Amino acid sequence: NTRLPLKIKRGMSIAFIGNTLLDRSQDFGYLETLLHQAHPSHDLTIRNLAWSADALGLQPRPANFADTDQHLVFVKADIIFTAFGFNESFAGPSGLAKFRGDLANYIAATKAKAFNGKTGPRLVLLSPIANENVEGVNAAVNNTNIRLYTEAMRDVAAAQRVGFVD
């Protein structure tokens, strides 16, 4: 079970996985900085394993490249921040039931693995961010879908007892 705010112990390993939200965050380092700033003497290990376009059911990688679980074992993840839901939202309302099921299955399977060799990880789900309304794109259409997927994530997170940040 993961309760927010997180109680982070000295020496913990934190991993970021998921879509472009976290993939691009490695260009700026804000999340890592905030975690280190909040826990300056904790000697945390923080690794960004996110890839643009990742979705719950699709994580394309080059041939002979380890999968996400193998990387989580390598970094001995104690806490995992996940960013999913944005890419899945393009399926619209008709894809919502599948997304709920996939997310619940993903959380249950991930919690059952001891990437650190001792215990299952604590999970924090991050909601997808809104589409920017730029010229040539009607962001309002997908922002409606994103709201639906965000609420589904909130519900699944509560049922699975993992953290959720919107």
Model feature map: region roles:
Residues R3, F16, D166:
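Residue-level signal for pocket-adjacent positions within structured domains
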Residues N1-R10:
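N-terminal pre-domain segments of enzymes
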